[in-house]
């Protein structure tokens, strides 16, 4: 797509008129120049840091706004989508009518008309047979920078054949004046129309809405083709052994998959088809709160020119204070995946997964650091998706909150959770993969399990040193827990040992078990769910 006149006509078709200069797939140097211009004000303007990366602020929206997520309910989505207003569920897919959509679209297209625009064409998905060709349209340079970092950058030759089958229009500066009359949550919106294949953004500057919006779309299209869509990081060893790490934001997906002894496939979103595991993205979106070079060298060294920092505190001398959470706990950096040295090249994909790791951050101090799951327990804990929401990843979350997130990514699911569990199970059985629950949360004394111990546990899983050690059964949860792991202090393996009295653990465990049981009631009316009840905790 090099014909600007054709591009102008296409923008007109979208409803965007009288466009000024178009920056089409701008280089990083042009983006750097445009996002740091002295004439920019407010959230548009980036600050150059000593590390070389540009830092931007996103205002009050330092995380996603799930209550402002809307899907047009029409003939395509009516019977397939997992709706917020149907059944016993916690879906974020709030339905809107075509009429409301039309008003939101007018709001965004008017905002994007009569001004210079940045247009970025990119791929979502490393496999050509299942990827989306996505066009991003924004008036803000750093938002174009963000998607250039996060999605797969087409070659010049691929751009000549690029025909978008999904469009994202980011009108962060506009808000919806009629939201009360329309019965919506607020003046801000992140809306999708699968018939028109468009995403609209208004009112929120948070970059992650573009990233996670496309993830929700991949989570719709792929499982319907029997391709697993997974909220996970993934890496591969020298022998071609693939491991995937499921987990919500802040549980360790990015950190634990950045392993100097293994090649990174990707840090957050993947598919699993007949050929193996593949990345949806071309970049990483890592949390930076309390980031240090010694603990996370790969991520630290990725923060350089072309990386984009979000909501970090930049000191007067341009130094970044990664320990300062005054803006948000959810400080972030996006960077192209090649900023990590040890990556799968030239395409972010590998073979079938052999190790499936569910990461959970247990704020109760009940679960052990690691458990080898049976096939039935794998399904139960995948559908439960227990973790704690960590500070700042969503608007209003300021301290750890115990929660259940189906498939470790409930906020991004477009279909019913059982459909993802079914496809994942099929892929696991075909590949003879094993699953483990790894707790990166807190013990009974309120101390978080150290990254050193967690890395040693992951190492033992990957090298199959955990499969043949003695185990004990943890009551209530009926989990098989190893008594020893090489490189790990054995005292931390039994969560009861971190309490002065076992009955303290017992009380907390019973409390948490009741939460598991109550949460799983939403699946008990299905044949699969009823069979899995015995694979969870019992009182």
UniProtKB/Swiss-Prot annotation:
One of its GO terms (molecular function) is phosphoenolpyruvate carboxykinase (ATP) activity. Mn(2+) binds at residues 212, 231, 268. It holds the Pfam family PEPCK_ATP. The keyword Phosphoprotein does not apply. ATP binds at residues 212, 231, 247-255, 296, 332, 448-449, 454. Substrate binds at residues 64, 206, 212, 332. One of its GO terms (biological process) is gluconeogenesis. It catalyses: oxaloacetate + ATP = phosphoenolpyruvate + ADP + CO2. Pathway: Carbohydrate biosynthesis; gluconeogenesis. It comes from the Bacteria. Its cofactor is Mn(2+). InterPro entries: PEP_carboxykinase_ATP, PEP_carboxykinase_C, PEP_carboxykinase_N, PEPCK_ATP_CS. One of its GO terms (cellular component) is cytosol. Keywords: ATP-binding, Cytoplasm, Decarboxylase, Gluconeogenesis, Lyase, Manganese, Metal-binding, Nucleotide-binding. Binds 1 Mn(2+) ion per subunit. Its EC number is 4.1.1.49. It is found in: Cytoplasm. Monomer. Belongs to the phosphoenolpyruvate carboxykinase (ATP) family. PANTHER family: PHOSPHOENOLPYRUVATE CARBOXYKINASE (ATP), PHOSPHOENOLPYRUVATE CARBOXYKINASE ATP. Involved in the gluconeogenesis. Catalyzes the conversion of oxaloacetate (OAA) to phosphoenolpyruvate (PEP) through direct phosphoryl transfer between the nucleoside triphosphate and OAA. This is Phosphoenolpyruvate carboxykinase (ATP).
